[in-house]
Regions:
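Phosphate-group recognition and catalysis centered on beta-loop-alpha active-site segments
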Residues: 7-335
């Protein structure tokens, strides 16, 4: 589907009479939202900077095809754990997602909870005291009270940001092309999350995280068209998930956080399924810390060279700066 961005009518590159060899029809992008800016469309040199996008790139692949494209082009998707918190940018806030998107991150793992009165929001902990100015349990608090809280960053600094509704984040993802990995918390259900995704029309911007075959089956039952991550290290695991109703074309194979399993990744790829792995975890123990201990992070390139497609990390900014594979994914496959 071609995105309309303030040029009427909007020609294709081949239809644009002003386009000549070495030129493309482009629009500038808002650095915060990733959306084309109105009244910036025009014919320019094909070496236009990275803050513009051609019409052909505006066509977003359906999410399963997008993952296939990244795998086939040996690209990498970097998933920012809890949305990519940074100084002044707390975890699980829309402003943090926008900040990380402007830094080139395109996949965001975020946590979905539900308030006492049934509003879904981004929040990791059961209690409010660590990441907000509030106290008590999320499940015991109405949305009107949650909405007034301020978010606190990892340095315990209060910000002007508030807990975001899931619906608002879904709409932002749909507009920007971002991909959300939704981690369901016990206060809500896959059924409720899937319903919100459908209502927002954001199915091509969402993966649901499962932690067991039962959860994978529950996701498939809630909406068989949604993509998900589920534990799989080859054909046997994939077949077992298929027997539970999981569509392999909607599957990303999660392979853990303890150590890279190159053989498992090769088996998943042989089945046409993208492997995922995490270097995140407890500070001092996670692979992120081990890989950066010598300052160069070369181990991340080893992951790419062995076929990894989706990397969940607590260091998305450093990894994105060190690798070219995420740039390759955007260049070849869009978003």
């Amino acid at each position: 589907m071609l995105l309309t961005v303030g040029c009427s009518p909007e020609p294709t590159e081949s239809e644009n009479p002003e386009a000549t060899q070495g030129q493309v029809y482009t629009c500038d992008l808002d650095p915060d939202t990733g959306k084309p800016l109105p009244d910036t469309c025009g014919t320019r040199s094909s070496d236009t900077g990275s803050n513009s996008i051609s019409l052909s790139e505006l066509k977003k692949l359906p999410l399963p095809a997008y993952f296939d494209c990244v795998r086939e082009n040996k690209g990498l998707l970097i998933a920012a754990h809890r949305g990519g918190p940074a100084p002044g940018y707390p975890e699980n806030t829309l402003e943090t997602l926008q900040h990380a998107f402007a830094e080139g991150i395109r996949v965001f793992e975020v946590d979905i909870a539900e308030s006492r009165d049934g509003v879904m929001l981004l929040m990791h902990d059961n209690r409010l005291n660590r990441t907000t100015t509030g106290d008590g349990y999320v499940a015991d608090t109405d949305w009107a009270d949650l909405a007034g809280l301020r978010m606190v960053d990892d340095d315990n600094q209060r910000t002007d940001f508030h807990p975001p509704k899931l619906t608002d984040v879904l709409l932002w993802a749909k507009q920007s092309g971002a991909i959300l990995e939704l981690d369901r918390k016990p206060t809500t259900s896959f059924k409720n999350i899937a319903s919100a995704v459908r209502a927002a029309g954001a199915g091509d911007n969402v993966l649901l995280i499962s932690y067991s075959d039962d959860e994978a089956a529950e996701i498939a039952a809630a909406d068989a068209g949604l993509m998900m991550t589920a534990g799989a290290k080859g054909s046997r695991d994939i077949g077992r998930l298929e027997a539970r109703g999981v569509d392999r074309t909607r599957l990303v194979a999660w392979t853990g956080t303890s150590s890279p399993d190159y053989a498992a990744w090769a088996r998943d790829i042989q089945e046409g399924v993208e492997p995922a792995f995490g270097t995140l975890g407890r500070k001092g123990e996670r692979l992120d810390d081990q890989y950066w201990a010598d300052g160069d992070g070369s181990e991340y390139q080893d992951l790419v060279d062995n076929g990894l497609v989706l990397l969940a990390t607590d260091e998305p900014y450093r990894v994105a700066a060190a690798l070219k594979s995420d740039d390759l994914a955007r260049e070849k496959c869009g978003r």
